[in-house]
């Protein structure tokens, strides 16, 4: 992980070998916005309105709108629900994040 003679922390890793990344609130918000754009793009590719997406996913239409605008935290369960409704993998929703 670290180059010879370089400490783990200087190489950007903690004691367990995991990267030490500090994200700001703005960084996290940008991830949710990008996720929302991906969900919207995939929904529109299927020709679905938010109402149809709500019916297919079991999520409330207003919640789908919040997700697409990046205005809400998205749980792993919600990611799975969205992926299943859109017939994609969770990783497809997370590409580019």
Specify the residue positions occupied by each region the protein language model found.
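Short, charged recognition helix plus adjacent turn
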Residues: 1-28, 84, 94-97
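Short basic helix-loop element that most often maps to the first helix and adjoining turn
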Residues: 37-56, 81
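Conserved hydrophobic/aromatic packing and binding residues within compact polymer-binding modules
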Residues: 39, 53-54, 64-67, 93
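Recognition helix of helix-turn-helix/homeodomain-like DNA-binding domains
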Residues: 58-72
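DNA major-groove recognition helix of helix-turn-helix/homeodomain DNA-binding modules
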Residues: 75-92
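A short, Lys/Arg-rich alpha-helix, primarily the initiator
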Residues: 21-45
């Amino acid at each position: 992980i670290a180059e010879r003679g370089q400490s783990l922390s200087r190489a950007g890793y903690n004691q367990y070998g995991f990267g030490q990344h500090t994200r700001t609130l703005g960084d996290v918000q940008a991830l949710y916005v990008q996720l929302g754009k991906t969900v919207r793009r995939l929904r529109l590719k299927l020709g679905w309105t938010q109402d149809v997406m709500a019916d297919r996913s079991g999520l409330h239409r207003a919640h789908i709108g919040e997700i697409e605008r990046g205005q809400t935290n998205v749980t792993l369960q919600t990611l799975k629900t969205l992926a299943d409704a859109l017939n994609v993998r969770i990783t497809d929703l997370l590409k580019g994040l």
